[in-house]
Curated annotation (Swiss-Prot):
Official protein name in the record: Neurexin-3a
Keyword Chloroplast tagged: no
GO cellular component terms, semicolon-separated: membrane
UniProtKB keywords: Angiogenesis, Calcium, Cell adhesion, Disulfide bond, EGF-like domain, Membrane, Metal-binding, Repeat, Signal, Transmembrane, Transmembrane helix
InterPro entries tied to this protein: ConA-like_dom_sf (IPR013320), EGF-like_dom (IPR000742), Laminin_G (IPR001791), Neurexin-like (IPR003585), Neurexin-related_CASP (IPR050372), Syndecan/Neurexin_dom (IPR027789)
Lineage per the UniProt record: Eukaryota, Metazoa, Chordata, Craniata, Vertebrata
Described function: Neuronal cell surface protein that may be involved in cell recognition and cell adhesion.
Skewed-composition ranges (Acidic residues): 1446-1461
Cytoplasmic side, ranges: 1644-1697
Subcellular locations according to the entry: Membrane
Organism name: Danio rerio
Bias (Polar residues) ranges: 1527-1547
Length: 1697
């Protein structure tokens, strides 16, 4: 036997047998330690122990992760406990407030909860938290107590200094891991002294100490004293007392009568057979607890009882002998009795004679009651006279009862939690050792629950803090029927919050109007305006009881105790009782479902909220602390419940932060800061911002008089309290701001502009529900002159009958008359009131802007915009937009109309907008009785307001800084108030005039607009200057609150009057309408397309629509639940593309989601996905190899603002741009494909095809074609990444899918939470087939469109086409460019073959492909004079060949060219150009606008007779793919082998060294390049549009398979050929023009002999398609050294050939 191991084995045996009785005595010697099995405290666990020591510095326990980062060390430092721990190298320290080196016993606990660690000392907890990346603690070592072994290597210690710390000296006992004793592995120099507790003898007067269940027990048998510590004198009965105490001590030494109660357990002793009848008695017991409240002992009923309880940490005694209660409270001097230490209680009642004063000195018998705690604190008193006997035949309850709240005289409602020991009742007749009787299971003693007959640690009911109003926890159903009780403590500094709520099953009840309403039984406690309220409904109506007189939001703890028995009950707040009685006769409270603590869940669809519960209606969640929740006397561990539910915003502690939270000025943008509970509260009302710190800009809605936003409630709403706020801006004096409306009643709460003031109308339809007293609508007014086009803030607060309206700083208050206070509504409407059935007078529609509409805590505009609510209808436009409502154009000065008489007798508010280039003209005139009249006119460009109220005419002239006939919109406001103050305001300039005398304007007859009738000009009053009508546009006409429709409401119309105001004037030319592209012609980066008579805007890549790209595109809102819009191409129309263009506008607050995804046919795996990840937007696509991602990584886009994202792909190259931010580009790595292209053009024997393919794969080739696109899905819910927010103006390769969805396209399905904003777009604005009919700047290089089979055959055209079709074959759709399986046509590239089907139809006007191929540029430029006619001719003859095959390919194929359009550069407003960006090597992209892949070259606008100028290009050159040097110039070399599969043309000649700058600055005088383009075909007139586009970096050339074809045909691409006669004429003209041009070319070359030459750099050429193989221009990485800054002079009228 190994004798050295014997002591350790003996120690282990002792520790195993004795368990918690074991005490570890540490001597403090160096080298001592005790080693326990590892404590798993990685995430959640508790460790507890008791200790005492007298040293000021010592190590108590330590463990770590083996030498890396994590450790935990508990020490005594300067007499206090110090906890130091680290998680993932994030370290912190916690120090106790109390000193522990006092040689007294202390209890310590360590609680681990993920990143938080709590140190508990004698019931006081302190905690700390770290913020590492890892969320848990790593633990490798075992746990060491008192020290660590000295032979442990320092390298394995995370905290090496632990070896040098002083060892612990003292005793440690009751070490437990989660209430279980750990295994002692080994120890050194530690004594396992069971009697260590008695080292310092607590027994007095010679008593002997022993340990029982870990506690000291004094044997007083050899002394003359008794008591726990032998400190009380024994009875003077010789010998008997000593015998009794000796026997008792022996019994205690054997087994002590102690029990643990956890809130649900209690003893019940039946007194029915032996009733108590005594005049003197004594109760003794000891208790130990952490709990503040709990029943200790009770006996008796009705008015004869004794109740002993713990109340708020003090001992409470209530005795009633029949004539009234005697109450006594014993409190310690410092602290509370709930300190988890043993306390002895002794209650005695003795019959005494008491001399009564005032009773003639007659001695009476009274009961003297004495209560003492720990033998020191004593309270003495007398029970009331007449009754001296305690009689009880009921039960003796110990530790609790079945319903503690219902016990007579009980000051608490919950049972005891802790340990009770030696509970003894005795009187002159009996002695009941209740604890012993329970332990031995006496027949008369009933034990409820699982009682443990030893003292165990009872987990404390830790408080929790609700840190945000949204935080809440759900509790199980409250099983209460006839009676029940709830108690809790709360602490807060905030005035409002819902604390408790639960309700029962919905029931149909009939109200006073005999209509069925859904009602429920419910119970609630709320904090409102600092007062506590109890609300109860048991089926017969709601009662609302105010339980406090003073405010209770002062940060102190308040104890709430609610007890109910049937209909009656009491609510106590800090012992102040308030009785209540429920309505009706029902005594059953029928509840169902969860009880909510602290607030309500976001999804409240299943909850029926009572109207009387104002905090629920107002969305006021509770912020503060809750502790000690007891339901029906049983404790609820709300901390554990909160942790299990993982409730957000809940913290397991309650500490009040020091200082004021607003001292740091956290509220931005002038938000008002208020102090909350450990938080600041920012009131953002009136700022235009929202969020916790008022940092996020609130969404703005713009209204034009016909627009609205309507929030439809999911169910009918009933409220008695409302908080409403909003901001508005308007130039009108009238208009609906906000209104609640009902489908069933006239109930409304309405805010509107009325005479430039805000009017509040509250109408509670009392008559409809048979109310006794009804006054009708209540109204309030506030504010003055609010139609000043400035932001104003409106607030409405209603609480029952009282209500208040605040406009800016103007406050108006009112009190409602009548008993009815409930508001019913189904909708919240803005802008236009659509629910009009119960409205006698419909309010005027609103024109202006609304922002920050907040109704009962919900920001409805932003919720609607972000898709957070599904019940929102709107057609108002988001954003601060210029509002031009219902414009009408008067095209001549003889045009006018008349309306009904203007009603402006006492006051007047007129508003209109106008736009004109004429300096004079009548705008408005109305005559009246006598000399009364009103006139508004434009005189020499200034507004005149002329009027006569009977005292003679007056004129007020506008004081504009400049004349107003500048073709810009101007705003005019004319007002006359009750004081006869007339004001004329034009734009921001106002003029006022006070007119004395008559105040009324009595008008008669028609109101004339924009002019007068015949002969009326001769009879105009004085001061009226105009003698002709108004020519221009009028809009937003407001006639004293009436918004007339000028055309439909007109009584008479004369002349040319049209709806709308589309005729515009440019800045440079105000003499007539603009017909040429200007810088500001197209908004939002739209592309201006010049035509002969006018211009149009291509808005495809803007997300906008309209004639000038300034109207929002079709918009859908995707809601919270996730929605999906899916488009499926028909099986025979699935396209394959080499280039893709995608644009969409969006706004969202989402961090992750898929916006759009395009997938190929099943089995192919190609896809393209636009998605948001971590708030950043990007595109990921796969076209045959690996995923390629392009991302905007610099800035997050989930800020709720509107963004436009543009994506283009050309092969493996891609660009992504958000708004006008920097462009993100991707260029694939790897070698050039020149070798591959060359090999593709050779005849490869079949047996070598596979090795060649494998070799290409080894060379890292990338595929370039997006094959067989089958589906477009929008919304992402099909891939578990749903998008939430707005999507607008989606454009993908010609498809406007959202337009198609709005028009009900049969190929589109809509599922889930998807809502269309506004009206369905007009027909024709969306495509219903695979590709669009117009593609002016929307070129798609389509390779496979009609089929997915690999068989080469002609396909039947789609049914929508009735003309000649050119159809592409479905070559190799499953693999982009496999040479072996799919060998291409001779000269072709990988199956990129199309077979034209040409049917000549001489009856149709000729049409040209809507997309034009690019023309490569040689280094010289030829210029000739241009006229309109020559332009038309040049476009037919100026492009002699669009093939590279030489003159053979330019024969009859071009006979039928009808390309008489011009390609002209232009640029939409808002485009960004940056010449400093680095050049790229993607030859298929544009020179300047890298997001557009059009086949056009940019030039600028005409001046006068289309004068063209030489370009101002950058310093880099365009380069063809293959070049040869010829002196100083370089020209393209064409390969005849590729002539059958590519299309180019003889290029125009540009100065060498002038092209291919990375970001070319657009100039207004770039040369014109005639290129074939599209027609707008009708049977009456043929238009030849001039197409303009941005300065493209480089454009991929189209790849038709036959010469003469201008583009790649898609599924809907049509090439129409006219008759052969027309073709012959065109051919002759083309040949003649060619000869002239060659002559001019030679002359120009001779004149420009000093031009530079090209350099060729093919290091970064990746994609070499057919365009580059045939002369398409390339980009260079180096700048030309000669002509970088050279400018071309051109003063002649010229254009390019």
């Amino acid at each position: 036997m190994n004798f050295f191991r014997f002591p350790v084995q003996l120690q282990l045996l002792i520790s195993t047998v004795l368990g918690p009785c074991l005490g570890l005595e540490f001597t403090g010697l160096q080298g001592q330690w005790a080693r326990y099995l590892r404590w798993d405290a990685s995430t959640r666990s508790d460790l507890s122990f008791q200790f005492k020591t007298d040293v000021s510095t010592a190590l108590i326990l330590y463990f770590d992760d083996g030498g890396f980062c994590d450790f935990l060390q508990l020490m005594v430092v300067e007499g206090k406990l110090q906890l130091q721990f680290s998680i993932d190298c994030a370290e912190t320290t916690v120090v106790s407030d109390k000193r522990v080196n006092d040689s007294s016993w202390h209890s310590a606990t360590l609680s681990r909860y993920n990143l938080r660690t709590v140190l508990g000392l004698d019931g006081v907890s302190k905690w700390a938290e770290v913020r590492p990346l890892r969320q848990y603690m790593k633990i490798v070592s075992d746990l060491f107590l008192g020290g660590v072994p000295q032979d442990i290597r320092i390298s394995v210690l995370t905290l090496p200094t632990v070896k040098d710390l002083p060892p612990f000296k003292g005793i440690i006992r009751e070490l437990k891991y989660n209430s279980k004793e750990p295994i002692l592995l080994s120890s050194q120099r530690v004594r396992m002294d069971i009697e260590g507790i008695c080292m310092e003898n607590p027994c007095e007067n010679g008593g002997t100490c022993s340990v029982v269940d870990g506690e000291p027990l004094c044997d007083c048998s050899k002394t003359e004293y008794v008591g726990r510590f032998c400190n009380e004198e024994a009875n003077n009965i010789p010998g008997f007392a000593h015998m009794m105490m000796a026997d008792q001590a022996k019994g205690k030494a054997r087994e002590e009568n102690v029990a643990t109660f956890r809130g649900s357990e209690f003893f019940c002793y039946d007194l029915s057979q032996n009733p108590i009848q005594s005049s003197s008695d004594e109760i003794t017991l000891s208790f130990k607890t952490w709990q503040r409240n709990g029943l200790i002992l009770h006996t008796g009923k009705s008015a004869d009882y004794v109740n002993l309880a713990l109340k708020d940490g003090a001992v409470s005694l209530v005795i009633n002998l029949g004539s009234g209660a005697f109450e006594a409270i014993v409190e310690p001097v410092n602290g509370k009795f709930n300190d988890n230490s043993w306390h002895d209680v002794k209650v005695t009642r003795n019959l005494r004679q008491h001399s009564g004063i005032g009773h003639a000195m007659v001695n009476k018998l009274h009961c003297l009651v004495t209560i003492s705690v720990d033998g020191i604190l004593t309270t003495t008193g007398y029970t009331q006279e007449d009754y001296t006997m305690l009689g009880s035949d009921d039960f003796f309850y110990v530790g609790g009862s079945p319903s503690t709240a219902d016990l007579p005289g009980s000051p608490v409602s919950n049972n005891f939690m802790g340990c009770l020991k030696e509970v003894v009742y005795k009187n002159n007749d009996i002695r009941l050792e209740l604890s012993r009787l329970a332990r031995i299971v006496d027949p008369k003693m009933k034990i409820q629950g699982d009682v443990v007959f030893k003292c165990e640690n009872v987990a404390t009911l830790d408080p929790i803090s609700f840190e945000t109003p949204e935080a809440y926890i759900s509790l199980p159903k409250w099983n209460t029927k006839r009676m029940g009780s709830i108690s809790f403590d709360f602490r807060t500094t905030e005035p409002n919050g819902l604390i408790l709520f639960t309700h029962g099953k919905p029931q149909e009840r009939k109200d006073a109007r005999s209509q069925k309403n859904t009602k429920v039984d419910f119970f609630a406690v709320e904090l409102l305006d600092g007062s506590l309220y109890l609300l109860l409904d048991m089926g017969s109506g709601t009662i609302k009881v105010k339980a406090t007189q003073n405010k209770v939001n002062d940060g102190a703890w308040y104890h709430v105790d609610i007890q109910r028995d049937g209909r009656s009950g009491t609510i106590s707040v800090n012992s102040r009782r308030t009785p209540f009685t429920a309505s009706g006769e029902n005594e059953i409270l029928d509840l169902e479902g969860d009880m909510y603590l602290g607030g309500l869940p976001d999804s409240r669809g299943s909850l029926i909220l009572p109207t009387e519960l104002w905090t629920a209606m107002l969305n006021y969640g509770y912020v503060g602390c809750i502790r000690d929740l007891f339901i029906d006397g049983r404790s609820k561990d709300i901390r554990q419940i909160a942790e299990a539910q993982n409730g957000a915003g809940i913290k397991p502690s309650c500490n009040k932060m020091s200082g004021k939270q607003c001292d740091s000025y956290p509220c931005k943008n002038k938000g008002l800061c208020k102090e909350g509970w450990n938080r600041f509260i920012c009131d953002c009302t009136g700022t235009g911002y929202w969020s916790r710190t008022c940092e996020r800009e609130a969404s703005i809605l713009s209204y034009d008089g016909s627009m609205y936003m309507k929030v439809v409630m999911p169910t009918v709403m009933h409220t008695e309290a409302e908080d409403v706020s909003l901001r508005f801006m308007s130039q009108r004096a009238y208009g609906l701001l906000m209104a609640t409306t009902s489908r069933d009643s006239a109930d409304t709460l309405r805010l509107e502009l009325d005479g430039s003031r805000v009017k509040l109308t509250v109408n509670l339809d009392c008559i409809r529900i048979n109310c006794n007293s009804s006054k009708g609508p209540e109204t309030l007014y506030a504010g003055q002159k609010l139609n000043d086009n400035e932001w104003h803030t409106v607030r409405v607060i209603r609480r029952g009958k009282s209500y208040k309206l605040t406009v800016d700083d103007d406050v108006a208050e009112g009190q409602m008359v009548g008993d009815h206070t409930r508001l019913e509504f189904h909708n919240i409407e803005t802008g236009v009131m659509t629910e009009r059935r119960f409205v006698s007078m419909i309010p005027s529609s609103f024109i202006g802007h609304l922002q920050s509409l907040k109704f009962n805590g919900l920001l409805y505009i932003d919720l609607c915009k972000n898709g957070d609510i599904d019940f929102c209808e709107l057609n108002a436009r988001f954003g601060m937009r210029s509002i031009i409502a219902d414009p009408v154009t008067f095209k001549s000065k003889n045009s006018y109309l008349s309306l009904a008489t203007l009603q402006a007798y006492t006051s007047m508010h007129l508003f209109f907008q106008f736009k004109t280039t004429s300096a004079d003209g009548f705008i408005l005139f109305n005559s009246g009785d006598g000399s009364d009249f009103i006139a508004v006119e434009l005189v020499k460009g200034y507004i005149h307001y002329v009027f006569n109220l009977g005292n003679g005419p007056n004129v007020i002239k506008g004081n504009s800084e400049r004349a107003l006939h500048d073709n810009q919109w101007h705003n005019v406001v004319i007002t006359r108030d009750n004081s006869n103050v007339h004001t004329l305001k034009v734009d921001a300039k106002a003029v006022s005039q006070v007119v004395n005398g008559a105040k009324n304007l009595d008008l008669k007859g028609d109101l004339f607009i924009a002019g007068l009738g015949p002969n009326m000009y001769n009879n105009l009053p004085k001061l009226v200057a105009s003698r002709e009508g108004f020519k221009g546009c009028l809009a937003s006409v407001d006639l004293n609150g009436r918004l007339p429709d000028l055309i439909n409401d007109a009584l008479f119309r004369s002349g040319q009057i049209e709806r709308g105001c589309e005729v515009g004037f440019t800045k440079a030319d105000l003499k007539g309408p603009s017909t040429t592209c200007q810088e500001d012609s197209c908004a939002n980066m739209g592309i201006c397309i010049q035509q002969w008579e006018n211009y149009t805007c291509d808005c495809s890549m803007t997300s906008y629509t309209g004639t000038h790209c300034n109207d929002p595109g079709t918009t859908y809102i995707f809601g919270k639940g996730g929605g999906l819009i899916s488009f499926n191409w028909p099986a025979n129309e699935r396209p394959s593309t080499r280039t893709d263009r995608l644009t969409v506008g969006f706004s969202t607050s989402l961090k992750d989601g898929i916006l759009i995804r395009i997938d190929s046919a099943p089995g192919l795996g190609d896809y393209l996905m636009l998605h948001i990840e971590q708030g950043k937007i990007g595109v990921t696509f796969n076209i045959g190899t690996a995923d390629i991602t392009v991302q905007e990584s610099s800035t997050a886009v989930n800020d709720g603002k509107y963004h436009v994202v543009r994506f283009t792909r050309n092969g493996g190259n891609a660009t992504l741009q958000v708004d006008n931010w920097a462009i993100n580009e991707h260029f694939p790595s790897g070698n050039s494909d020149n070798e591959r292209i060359q090999m593709a053009n050779k005849k490869i024997p079949f047996k070598y095809a596979r090795p060649v393919e494998e070799w290409l794969q080894e060379k890292g080739r990338q595929l370039t074609i997006f094959n067989t696109q089958a589906t477009i899905t929008i919304g992402g819910s099909d891939r578990k990444r749903p998008f939430q927010g707005q999507l607008s103006g989606l454009y993908y390769n010609g498809l406007k899918v959202l337009n198609m969805a709005a028009q009900g396209n049969p190929n589109i399905k809509i599922n889930g939470s998807v809502r269309l904003v506004g009206e369905v777009p007009a027909a024709g604005s969306a495509r219903t087939t695979a590709l669009p009919p117009e593609m002016s700047t929307a070129f798609i290089e389509t390779t496979t469109t009609m089929s997915t089979t690999t068989t080469r055959k002609h396909r039947t055209p789609p049914t929508i086409q009735t003309t000649d079709d050119m159809v592409s074959s479905a070559e190799c759709s499953s693999d982009d460019e496999d040479f072996a399986e799919c060998e291409g046509h001779a000269g072709g590239l990988g199956g990129e073959l199309v077979f034209p089907v040409i049917v000549k139809d001489p009856l149709e006007l000729p049409s040209v492909a809507t997309r034009t191929p690019s023309i490569p540029f040689p280094p010289t430029l030829t210029i000739i004079e241009t006229t309109k006619e020559s332009l038309s001719m040049a476009t037919e003859a100026g492009v002699p060949c669009l093939s590279d095959g030489g003159s053979d390919d330019c024969g009859d194929d071009d006979d039928d060219d009808d390309d008489d359009g011009l390609m002209i550069s232009g640029y939409g407003s808002g485009e960004a150009y940056d010449s400093n960006l680095p050049p790229t090597d993607d030859e298929d992209f544009y020179t300047t606008f890298s997001l557009v892949t059009d086949k056009t070259l940019s030039s600028s606008t005409f001046e006068g007779g289309y004068k063209a100028h030489a370009p101002k290009w950058g310093s880099k050159d365009f380069r063809p793919n293959k070049v040869f040097d010829s002196g100083r110039t370089t020209t393209a070399s064409f390969s005849p082998k590729l002539s059958r599969s590519t299309t180019t043309s003889t290029p125009p000649k540009l100065p060498a060294g002038k092209m291919n700058h990375r970001e070319l600055k657009p100039q207004p005088d770039i040369v014109l390049l005639p290129l074939p383009t599209s027609y707008e075909v009708d049977n009456t007139k043929m238009k030849s549009p001039l197409i303009t586009s941005p300065m493209f970096r480089n454009v991929p050339t189209a790849i038709p398979t036959e010469p003469g074809i201008r583009r790649v045909p898609g599924a809907s691409e049509v090439v129409r050929e006219s008759s052969s006669t027309t073709g012959m004429v065109v051919g002759i003209v083309a040949a003649a023009a060619l000869c002239i041009l060659i002559l001019l070319y030679a002359m120009y070359k001779y004149r420009n002999r000093d031009e530079g030459s090209y350099q060729v750099d093919e290091t970064r050429n990746y994609i070499t398609n057919s365009a580059q193989s045939n002369g398409a221009v390339m980009k260079d990485k180096q700048q030309s050294t000669k002509s970088g800054n050279k400018k071309q002079k051109n003063k002649d009228k010229e254009y390019y050939v």
